[in-house]
């Protein structure tokens, strides 16, 4: 029996021209454990997203075993809630067989969709599981019409857009592509474009692309300008939390399909309260066509978790309002200020209520936080104090006068939220009962989705003059649904007079009918193992003759670096600055335009291009395309995606270890009996982060970007261990933070050639021209003469010898 979701989804009237159409709005809540699962479904979510014990981008959340996922899916479907499974990490070749077992299990156990980052996995799932929906993860970093068009052709049903995408572009994607769009509306924000961040991976061996981000963006850094500090130690990269409640009307009217709440690692109280806040706001706007007054709601959300709120890039927040540089964690709600200090007590002037068992934090150089056990107002102990009152508290630390006081936990509010989380919403059903002499009793149960369950008793009612059953008692027995997920909204009885019906028979009939209804409601898709297509995907090759030596590719950032290459026969030269590209071509006619991590445009005068986004693949008919090392190619199936789109030359991910690289190349050989032109980075500072936010402008108290300070000064971030991370920007003020150490794999180039790598890559970022020449000469001598004449200071092997990311 097929179930429609229509009745469980919020509907909005969206005007298009002179007509009006109905647009579904889905509220999608995060679930990291069973407590947050119940909090989400009991507070208005009509879809949830969860992760298993593997392949989930929140590896440190509790997550779920396979059997727990099976139970969760059944229970969610019973409550008319869809379940999307996050399979949103990059996948290594040696994990494919384990992953397939996991996906088969999820497919056969009724998961509604897979959330996927890995391009190869997207393609593989589209071919193997034709009856499941694919949602592209925000980790794929989709922010343009061209990217969305490409992914739609791959079989994608929905795209979770990059958080950097402004609402105007969101609307363009919806209108021009015709695909479901999901956006984040609340929760933590990454400072780097999702899927491009290697910072945790490189400095801490915990890859964000593998679900293990250690959040180094929440650490302190000092901004240096021309080698001198230009800031105190601050949390320069710590983003505020997204909150779009006050603009929910604009989001509804935009045509977005799904509103997503971030927070699989947050508490059940957080999940419940945030879900309820957005559910209430959406319903209110749809009913009244005006915004709900969210003042009280916003106070609750501040108390649960916030690092200060922002409207984000989605709603064009100012650059200086995107981050909080003085603290990276939960700050709560401001409740007052310290107005007097004594050896063991303080007085606080309140602007908000404060109660016993609340937790406060006093903001000073060394924050002080504690739970309130007792407090006084006007020398009397009180359980609660109110705005404008002066409250006296005992303290055991040195407190600064005039320090701001924030409440970071409200005991009473938490209790109210926990109670709301437990309030199960009952599903309305209609019962129809009939009983006639010497015939089996019949009970029919119907729900609003169209399920109709009929059960019959083995017992045949008998006539009785004294112990017959009246209709009132029958209805009372049949509607005893307290321990179920249902409530009876109507019951009809057709009962012949003076029949003897034992109560246990009525109870048995009710229990059997409810069990069958529950079973029917919990299965949405009715899939079978025969649905799974086992045909392997392949890639389209152009035969090539292998070069007797490794080819050399070099990426440079400026004309001076390019000029330094003039005396070297470099095979591929990549150049990124569009403004000076014409000049670059005059210096060296072999130069190839590199689009950069975010830009997708290719100058017409460039016959070839190094691309970083699938949105650039539309240029394949007019340009020779090369996939960059940052395209996240970590398995043979992603290789096939690029091959099938005419790209024969591709860079493999710098997150691949030596073993993973070998396994990938061997698998491509095994499946296709030949190799495309593989490129691998052996020298250069990795791009740890690429971001839209400019912390340089903010440090100088500028509201917006385009200050051009980066054009006249050299900037870097210095962390608590005194590692220096150079900074470069592009013409659109996107900021790239480079690694503090330089990758240097000169001792491995023989291995790379032996396994099938054709091109080794040198990336230059902040190097002076002389350094460029020294490094190129070093690698040229190694390739052609097997000589090694120099060492590179502050070098790193990156992940080449690290299998566990």
Regions found by a protein language model. Name each.
Residues 2, 6-13, 18:
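Short, positively charged and aromatic/hydrophobic N-terminal segments
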Residues 19-142, 160-258, 265-805:
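Active-site pocket-lining/capping segments in soluble small-molecule metabolic enzymes
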């Amino acid at each position: 029996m097929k179930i429609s979701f229509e009745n469980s989804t919020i509907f909005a009237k969206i005007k298009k021209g002179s007509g009006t159409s109905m647009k579904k709005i889905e509220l999608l809540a995060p679930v990291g454990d069973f407590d947050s699962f119940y909090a989400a479904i009991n507070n208005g979510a009509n879809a949830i997203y969860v992760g298993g014990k593997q392949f989930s981008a929140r590896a440190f959340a509790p997550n779920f075993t396979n059997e727990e996922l099976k139970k969760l899916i059944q229970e969610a479907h019973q409550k008319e809630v869809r379940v999307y499974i996050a399979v949103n990490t990059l996948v290594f070749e040696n994990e494919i067989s384990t992953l397939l077992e996991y996906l088969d299990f999820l497919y056969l156990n009724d998961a509604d969709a897979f959330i996927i980052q890995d391009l190869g996995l997207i393609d593989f799932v589209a071919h193997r599981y034709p009856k499941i929906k694919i949602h592209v993860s925000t980790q794929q970093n989709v922010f343009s019409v061209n990217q969305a068009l490409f992914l739609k052709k791959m079989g994608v049903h929905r795209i979770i857009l990059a958080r950097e995408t402004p609402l105007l572009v969101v609307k363009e994607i919806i209108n021009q592509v015709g695909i479901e769009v999901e956006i984040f509306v609340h929760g933590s924000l990454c400072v780097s474009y999702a899927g491009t961040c290697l910072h945790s991976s490189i400095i801490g061996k915990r890859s964000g692309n593998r679900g293990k981000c250690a959040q180094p963006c929440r650490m302190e850094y000092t901004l240096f300008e021309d080698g001198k500090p230009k800031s105190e130690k601050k949390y320069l990269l710590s983003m505020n939390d997204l909150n779009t409640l006050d603009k929910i009307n604009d989001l509804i009217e935009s045509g977005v399909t799904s509103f997503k709440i971030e927070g699989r690692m947050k508490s059940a109280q957080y999940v419940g309260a945030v879900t309820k806040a957005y559910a209430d706001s959406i319903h209110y706007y749809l009913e009244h066509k005006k915004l709900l007054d969210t003042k009280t709601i916003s106070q609750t959300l501040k108390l649960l978790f916030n690092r200060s709120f922002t409207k984000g890039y989605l709603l064009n927040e100012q650059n200086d309002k995107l981050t909080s540089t003085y603290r990276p964690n939960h700050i709560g709600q401001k409740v007052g200020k310290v107005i007097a200090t004594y050896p063991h007590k303080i007085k606080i002037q309140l602007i908000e209520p404060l109660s016993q068992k609340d937790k406060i934090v006093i903001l000073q150089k060394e924050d002080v936080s504690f739970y309130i056990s007792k407090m006084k107002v006007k020398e009397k102990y009180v359980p609660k104090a109110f705005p404008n009152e002066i409250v006296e508290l005992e303290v055991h630390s040195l407190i600064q006068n005039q320090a701001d006081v924030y409440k970071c936990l409200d005991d009473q509010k938490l209790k109210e939220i926990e109670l709301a989380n437990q309030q199960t919403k009952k599903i309305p059903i209609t019962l129809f009962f009939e009983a006639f002499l010497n015939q089996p009793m019949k009970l029919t149960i119907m729900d609003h989705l169209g399920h109709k369950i009929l059960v019959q008793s083995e017992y045949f009612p008998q006539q009785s003059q004294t112990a017959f059953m009246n209709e009132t008692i029958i209805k009372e027995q049949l509607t005893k649904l307290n321990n179920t997920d249902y409530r009876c909204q109507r019951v009809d009885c057709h009962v012949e007079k003076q029949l003897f019906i034992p109560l246990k028979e009525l109870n048995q009939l009710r229990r059997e009918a409810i069990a069958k209804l529950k079973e029917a409601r919990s299965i949405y898709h009715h899939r079978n193992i025969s649905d799974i297509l086992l045909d392997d995907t392949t890639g389209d090759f152009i035969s090539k003759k292998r070069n007797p030596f490794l080819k050399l590719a070099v990426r440079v950032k400026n004309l001076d670096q390019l000029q330094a290459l003039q005396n070297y026969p470099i095979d591929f030269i990549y150049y990124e600055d569009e403004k000076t590209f014409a000049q670059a071509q005059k210096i060296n006619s072999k130069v190839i335009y590199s689009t950069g991590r975010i830009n997708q445009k290719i100058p017409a005068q460039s016959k070839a291009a190094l691309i970083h986004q699938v949105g650039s693949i539309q240029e394949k008919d007019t340009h020779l395309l090369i996939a960059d090392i940052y395209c996240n190619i970590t398995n043979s199936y992603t290789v096939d995606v690029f091959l099938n789109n005419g790209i024969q030359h591709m860079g493999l991910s710098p997150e691949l270890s030596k073993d993973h690289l070998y396994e990938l190349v061997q698998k491509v050989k095994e499946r296709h009996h030949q190799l495309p032109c593989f490129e691998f980075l052996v020298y250069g500072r990795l791009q740890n982060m690429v971001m839209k936010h400019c912390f340089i402008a903010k440090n100088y108290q500028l509201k917006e970007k385009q200050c051009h300070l980066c054009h006249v000064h050299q900037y870097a971030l210095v962390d608590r261990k005194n590692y220096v991370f150079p900074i470069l920007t592009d013409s659109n003020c996107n900021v790239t933070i480079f690694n503090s150490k330089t990758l240097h794999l000169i001792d491995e180039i023989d291995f790379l050639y032996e396994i099938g790598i054709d091109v080794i890559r040198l990336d230059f970022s902040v190097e002076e021209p002389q350094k460029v020449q020294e490094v190129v000469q070093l690698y040229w001598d190694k390739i052609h003469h097997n000589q090694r004449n120099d060492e590179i200071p502050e070098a790193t092997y990156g992940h080449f010898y690290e299998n566990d990311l």
